[in-house]
């Protein structure tokens, strides 16, 4: 399950309700949708194709519809990062640069896991997410993304506009990232 790790003092929060409560103070949405409804072969398949994508999106149709209506999102797709991803290290180098978006960054983790370090006040909070969990990093929040030791993640991404997801880097700001 999710875990928050505060870099300044090493504090860890693992209780889902405490995570949800803390993050909501800063506009970050955290929720658990679970993965029980997905057949394991669909969930674990990292060779994504149209049939696999449709099966995943259909399995979460109700939650996606509610999220879209509540937050104004219009479309979704599936993203996969794994050892099979061409130029994975090059992609990860881009994702590990501190940035923000003009739109929310919405990810529902279908399989795998990852870390969203987010600047919160004068600290950096590592938000560890796993299969079955939803995270919404609000527009304008300074953050980046890292794969964890498993080096794979499969997510539903949700957008208001495709252009809104483009990263905006500020070369004058630096973040403390793990190498």
Swiss-Prot record:
EC primary class: oxidoreductase
Enzyme Commission number, as recorded: 1.13.11.54, 1.13.11.53
Keywords from the named record: Amino-acid biosynthesis, Dioxygenase, Iron, Metal-binding, Methionine biosynthesis, Nickel, Oxidoreductase
Pfam families in alphabetical order: ARD
Annotated catalysed reactions: 1,2-dihydroxy-5-(methylsulfanyl)pent-1-en-3-one + O2 = 3-(methylsulfanyl)propanoate + CO + formate + 2 H(+); 1,2-dihydroxy-5-(methylsulfanyl)pent-1-en-3-one + O2 = 4-methylsulfanyl-2-oxobutanoate + formate + 2 H(+)
Site (Important to generate the dianion): 107
Residues carrying the site annotation May play a role in transmitting local conformational changes: 104
Keyword Acyltransferase: no
Binding annotation for Ni(2+): 99, 101, 105, 143
Family affiliation: Belongs to the acireductone dioxygenase (ARD) family.
Subunit description: Monomer.
Function: Catalyzes 2 different reactions between oxygen and the acireductone 1,2-dihydroxy-3-keto-5-methylthiopentene (DHK-MTPene) depending upon the metal bound in the active site. Fe-containing acireductone dioxygenase (Fe-ARD) produces formate and 2-keto-4-methylthiobutyrate (KMTB), the alpha-ketoacid precursor of methionine in the methionine recycle pathway. Ni-containing acireductone dioxygenase (Ni-ARD) produces methylthiopropionate, carbon monoxide and formate, and does not lie on the methionine recycle pathway.
The name this protein goes by in its record: Acireductone dioxygenase
